[in-house]
């Protein structure tokens, strides 16, 4: 009787056991499934962040995304969200889109693809102002100059190391791009003579200088001997579970390298080779 009771008790527990196993397996499976839309290239983007992206599709990331969509035979759709705190969490990781364009290689928030360009922070000055030959923030000709800097960006450290903070004008790093454009404001101050030089992320520097009211010189900061790194490889970001999707994007990047570089160059992005020299077309 004791054995029979044990058998009955075991039998009664079996359904619950298998249900638990099934649920665990399903959870594991869902964690590994790539939830990439098969018909639509869903891109996470900032709605007002030129030269990278905007809702009108005028940024170079918009153009690269359109190129990839054509190659994939997919329609293109966007999930727009201001590029501030919570961007990855509320877009890619919320499964509202499947790829973020323009992610620095090594960013742990996403799984990065192979890079599709290499660039650096840059120094922008007015043509004819005498600062054009400067190639490094260590140059003594910068002493006493009024320099614009986005707060908290790598060049700020180099300004401190080289004793250039006295006349620095700081602009905010984290803003809602729907309302504020600190980089454009900085270039406006440079045009108006309120600062003598501007330090900006290369793609922004090149684009704004290209569209400035007066001729500007953009110098990629590739000769710094101290401070944080100025040069970065830029790829795309996908979810950590999306291995096949990452491999497909890597294939597309390799196959369309020339077209991607052409798009970037048309926006004035300072493009560097592996020896830190500007690519020949620039």
List PLM regions with ranges:
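Bacterial N-terminal signal peptides that target proteins for export
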Residues: 1-8
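C-terminal segment of classical bacterial N-terminal signal peptides
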Residues: 13-22
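Ligand-binding clefts/hinges and TM-proximal coupling segments of bilobed small-molecule sensing domains
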Residues: 26-27, 33, 154-175, 217, ...
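Extracytoplasmic small-molecule ligand-binding "clamshell" domains
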Residues: 27-108, 177-180, 266-267
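Periplasmic-binding protein-like
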Residues: 46-47, 118-130, 210-253, 267-282
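Bilobed "Venus flytrap"/periplasmic-binding protein-like clamshell domains
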Residues: 47-51, 55-71, 123-182, 203-204, ...
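Acidic, polar ligand-binding/catalytic clefts
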Residues: 66, 70, 75-141, 152, ...
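Alpha-to-beta junction loops
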Residues: 73-75, 93-102, 145-146, 186, ...
């Amino acid at each position: 009787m004791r054995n029979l009771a044990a058998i009955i008790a075991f039998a009664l527990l079996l359904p619950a056991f298998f249900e638990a196993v099934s649920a665990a397996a399903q959870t594991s499976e869902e964690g590994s499934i790539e939830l990439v839309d098969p018909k639509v290239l869903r891109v996470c983007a900032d709605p007002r962040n030129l030269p990278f992206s905007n809702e009108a599709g005028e940024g170079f990331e918009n153009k690269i995304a359109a190129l990839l969509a054509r190659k994939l035979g997919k329609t293109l759709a966007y999930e727009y969200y201001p590029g501030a705190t919570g961007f990855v969490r509320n877009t890619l990781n919320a499964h509202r889109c499947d790829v973020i364009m323009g992610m620095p290689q090594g960013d742990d928030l996403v799984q990065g693809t192979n890079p599709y360009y290499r660039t650096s922070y840059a120094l922008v000055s007015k043509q004819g102002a005498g600062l054009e030959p400067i190639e490094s923030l260590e140059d003594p000709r910068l002493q006493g100059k009024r320099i614009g800097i986005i707060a908290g960006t790598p060049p700020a450290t180099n300004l401190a190391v080289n004793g250039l903070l006295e006349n620095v004008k700081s602009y905010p790093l984290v803003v809602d791009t729907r309302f504020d454009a600190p980089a454009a404001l900085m270039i406006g101050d440079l045009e108006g003579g309120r600062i003598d030089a501007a330090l900006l992320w290369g793609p922004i520097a090149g684009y704004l200088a290209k569209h400035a009211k007066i001729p500007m010189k953009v110098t990629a900061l590739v000769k710094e001997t101290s401070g944080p790194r100025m040069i970065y490889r830029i790829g795309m970001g996908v979810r950590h579970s999306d291995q096949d999707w990452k491999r497909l994007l890597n294939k597309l990047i390799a196959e369309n390298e020339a077209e991607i570089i052409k798009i970037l160059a048309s926006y004035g992005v300072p493009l560097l080779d592996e020896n830190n020299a500007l690519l020949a077309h620039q």
